[in-house]
């Protein structure tokens, strides 16, 4: 089958073949980072370790201030060095077991743990940032091959919400559900910039999953949601839908990654509604599509068997300002052994 993501990279002019479905990432490849000063962080880490069988040597303990949305570059650099010193060589990915902080100066905390703090991944105003070496990569061992460890937060509006998100991720493995990807063409011109890709996504990936392009601001009462991509400040009626285990949903807007902000809808609302992962920016990104997930890449890679953290991370070209939250090991389309 023609590979959509390659076509996008070269302005839809080249073709390639999608890879065979892959096996899910393993517990030995994931490390959980715990903030020992945060009681909820300790509980989340313990719950996730048990649910996913993460080895004890992959439990990394740090100390950070509790309750702050952001930490500074200097403090983060100290913490990051401690994390690197505790990380076994087999680890390819980090699961960050807390909801705050979610920002490091001008970077998201997931990007800071992935790349190390680097102002090349930041931007003041409407400017590009450094491209991720992981973007649309076929790497299965990012630490070994690219010297990065993609990171995802185990975060939520409440402790019980985080537990539920983890449970949905575990339940997703090998499910191969009858599902739909919903691509919303909204009335918000500034935030609807991804919609130009929708026709070719639908044309090329409909054999892998049912895809519906919906010309509306609201999707409601659907019972088969695996993907929901839209562009709005606030998305109504999301709780009316049934999100299948492993579902990915996000809304392209400026501050969705401000987890507890009120100016715009937080990405946590998707998780409250039943999604297993979402994405949002922590710093004003402007409407660069490169700073948000490319729906075609996510859909293609996820339905071809990659884990959630792989497919989602690989879909963002400029992720420095973007926050990934979800259950990283969820693999609804992976081959099970």
Model-derived segments and spans:
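Bacterial N-terminal signal peptides that target proteins for export
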Residues: 1-9
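Cleavable N-terminal signal peptides
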Residues: 10-11, 21
């Amino acid at each position: 089958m023609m590979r959509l993501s390659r076509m996008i990279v070269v302005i839809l002019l080249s073709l390639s073949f999608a890879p065979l479905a892959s096996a899910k990432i393993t517990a030995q490849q994931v490390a959980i980072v715990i903030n020992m000063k945060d009681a909820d962080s300790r509980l989340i880490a313990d719950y996730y370790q048990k649910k996913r069988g993460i080895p004890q040597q992959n439990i990394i303990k740090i100390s950070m201030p509790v309750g702050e949305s952001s930490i500074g570059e200097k403090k983060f650099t100290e913490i990051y060095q401690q994390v690197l010193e505790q990380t076994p060589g087999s680890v390819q990915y980090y699961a960050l077991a807390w909801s705050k902080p979610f920002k490091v100066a001008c970077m998201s905390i997931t990007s800071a743990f992935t790349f190390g703090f680097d102002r090349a991944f930041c931007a003041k105003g409407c400017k590009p940032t450094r491209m991720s070496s992981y973007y649309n990569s076929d790497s299965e061992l990012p630490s070994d091959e690219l010297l990065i460890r993609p990171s995802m937060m185990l975060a939520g509006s409440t402790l019980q919400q985080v537990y539920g998100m983890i449970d949905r991720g575990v339940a997703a493995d090998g499910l191969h559900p009858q599902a739909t990807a919903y691509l919303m063409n909204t009335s918000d011109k500034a935030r609807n910039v991804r919609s130009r890709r929708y026709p070719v996504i639908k044309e090329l990936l409909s054999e892998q999953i049912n895809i519906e392009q919906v010309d509306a601001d609201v999707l409601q009462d659907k019972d088969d949601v695996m993907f929901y991509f839209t562009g709005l400040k606030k998305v109504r009626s999301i709780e009316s839908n049934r999100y299948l285990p492993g579902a990915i949903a996000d809304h392209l807007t400026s501050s969705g990654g401000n987890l507890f902000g009120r100016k715009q809808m937080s990405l946590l609302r998707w998780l409250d509604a039943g999604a297993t992962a979402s994405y949002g920016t922590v710093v004003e990104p402007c409407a660069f599509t490169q700073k948000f997930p490319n729906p075609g890449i996510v859909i293609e890679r996820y339905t071809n068997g990659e884990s959630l953290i792989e497919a989602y991370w690989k879909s963002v070209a400029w992720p420095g300002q973007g926050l990934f939250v979800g259950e990283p090991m969820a693999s609804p389309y992976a081959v099970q052994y």
